[in-house]
Amino acid sequence: MSEIQIRPTIAGDLPRLMGMNHAVKSEYVWQLELRRESDQIVATFHEVRLPRPIPLTYPNNPFALADEWTRRPAIFTALADNNPIGYLSLMDRPGSVAWVSDLVVSPDWRRRGVASGLLNAAQAWGVTGGHRRLFLEVQSKNQPAIRLAQKHGYEFCGYNDHYYLTQDVALFFARALK
């Protein structure tokens, strides 16, 4: 197996990153249930197994990377044999917070530690830059991303229905950086 390397993205990576298959298949969804009571609203998420795997359209425009990559504080590319196989894009937010807006791994390289490597690079970048917290946003149907967040100690911290252009629910996970 090829050794995976993580480094800052360079211009030559962009065509391969934008052309990557960004879609994911999921067997579960976090289903939102809102219950209104006299003095409160209770939001509960239940993990529900779907009758069959569903394909998920990536909620962001992959081609926007060409315009945004120089404006982002950091974008990391994962490589195998000098070929881009994944990337992670970060944004700064007020209050010493960093936000992972894109985390994509080529289908042939999924479940091989690539996303974990990218996330570790983002966390190291956040610590070096003095960020206190790192946030991840994921679609409520993206079970692989939810599992990744949980595996790395990220805690569920909120949601926004109709967050994406696809009108999907976004789940937010965060962890403190040390």
Name each model-derived stretch.
Residues 156-158:
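A secondary-structure capping/hinge motif
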Residues 2-5:
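Extreme N-terminal starter segment of soluble prokaryotic enzymes
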Residues 126-137:
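Conserved GNAT acetyl-CoA-binding A-motif
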Residues 106-112, 140-141:
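Active-site acidic-Proline motif in GNAT/NAT acetyltransferases
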